Amino acid sequence: MEQQKALDLSFFEQSTIEVAKGLIGMHLVHELDGVTLIGRITETEAYLGVLDRACHSYGRRRTKRTAILYEEAGRCYTYTMHTHCLLNVVCEQKGQPEAVLIRAIEPISGVKEMERLRGKPHTSREFANGPGKLTKAMGITMADYGRLLTEPPLYFAKGDHTNASIVATKRIGIKGAGPCSHHPWRFIDGNSRAVSAYRP
């Protein structure tokens, strides 16, 4: 497979909603121990900062964990939930703490290594159809926190966005976010089976 072309920093400086939609069909690439792992992104969620009750920076909260959200766009925001590492990319301008959560991928390249990391065959619908599943398959850990995701070894690259049928739905698992839980800020490729089990 030819060398992947990383997305420019300007891509992540767009509105967070546009980034979340625009990443559907793009590639997530991890050059790990001599193997290039590539997954096609099929599901994302947008988190819109200080006014979004579901966002870690709601009300301008700032902790050691969330500090990276206030930095430049394109940075990696990883955190753990129920022992799983979740991958987010920081968006907008510095000081505007918004991010996109990567929720699911389809394996494209480096599949054998991804299967080894995940402990499951890539043909399984459950292989990477969730944020904790995809980080395990891609070898992404908390050590990647703060990394700039526009250059190797971990980055986003141009894929085939035009083949995606983008569907917007409510986000998953944020019932405590009040009215914000109803915003259609989750985006999936309606043509893909590799998305979270929840559908509207």
From Swiss-Prot:
It comes from the Bacteria. The keyword DNA repair applies. It holds the Pfam family Pur_DNA_glyco. InterPro entries: Formyl_transferase-like_C_sf (IPR011034), MPG (IPR003180), MPG_sf (IPR036995). It is an enzyme of class 3 (hydrolase). Its EC number is 3.2.2.-. One of its GO terms (biological process) is base-excision repair. Gene3D superfamilies: Methylpurine-DNA glycosylase (MPG). Keywords: DNA damage, DNA repair, Hydrolase. One of its GO terms (molecular function) is alkylbase DNA N-glycosylase activity. The keyword DNA damage applies. Belongs to the DNA glycosylase MPG family. HAMAP family: 3MGH. This is Putative 3-methyladenine DNA glycosylase.
